[in-house]
Amino acid sequence: MVDLKTKKVIIIGDRDGVPGEAIKLCAESAGAEVVYAATECFVUTSAGAMDLENQKRVKDLAEKYGPENVIVLLGGAEAESSGLACETVTVGDPTFAGPLAGVSLGLLCYHVAEPEIKSQIDPAVYEEQVSMMEMVMDVNAIIAEISEYRNKGCKFL
């Protein structure tokens, strides 16, 4: 199982899901070192792709800390947008529009609501920051989508 305390955490939250700041509070409650946190509007970006500036930051941070030392935590409200974000940080930008086009970082990537991550977060912090969104998200579909890309593209499982 992944241990958040041993990783540099990059957070890509979702305006319509779990915001970056909420995920940051959760990760910090688990003892993680958060090196970047942002909140995207996946509906606003072209085809639901990851924001180009966030792609650049992810790439730069993976190079700085070593991809084996980095984990990306997502807060997407929908399976498809979460899957696209996971695909981007593992096998590369599927839209071929950003800095990660053709770049396979192979980063470890999870949604904040996945049991492997949720179990490490202080329950009171999770309740306050994530639980309301968890009730309206299709968590099983999100996990299935992210797991597919993580298992296919992550080099550090």
UniProtKB/Swiss-Prot annotation:
Keyword RNA-binding: no
Record EC number: 1.21.4.2, 1.21.4.3, 1.21.4.4
Active site as annotated: U44
InterPro entries listed in its UniProt record: GRDA (IPR006812)
Keyword Oxidoreductase: yes
Pfam family, one: GRDA
Molecular function terms from GO: betaine reductase activity; glycine reductase activity; sarcosine reductase activity
UniProt catalytic activity: acetyl phosphate + [thioredoxin]-disulfide + NH4(+) + H2O = [thioredoxin]-dithiol + glycine + phosphate + H(+); acetyl phosphate + methylamine + [thioredoxin]-disulfide + H2O = sarcosine + [thioredoxin]-dithiol + phosphate + H(+); acetyl phosphate + trimethylamine + [thioredoxin]-disulfide + H2O = glycine betaine + [thioredoxin]-dithiol + phosphate + H(+)
UniProt keyword list: Oxidoreductase, Selenocysteine
CC annotations in GO: glycine reductase complex
NCBIfam families: reduct_selen_A
Quaternary structure and partners: Monomer. Component of the glycine, sarcosine and betaine reductase complexes, together with components B and C.
Function: In the first step of glycine, betaine and sarcosine reductases, the substrate is bound to component PB via a Schiff base intermediate. Then the PB-activated substrate is nucleophilically attacked by the selenol anion of component PA to transform it to a carboxymethylated selenoether and the respective amine. By action of component PC, acetyl phosphate is formed, leaving component PA in its oxidized state. Finally component PA becomes reduced by the thioredoxin system to start a new catalytic cycle of reductive deamination.
Family the UniProt entry places it in: Belongs to the GrdA family.
Protein name: Glycine/sarcosine/betaine reductase complex component A
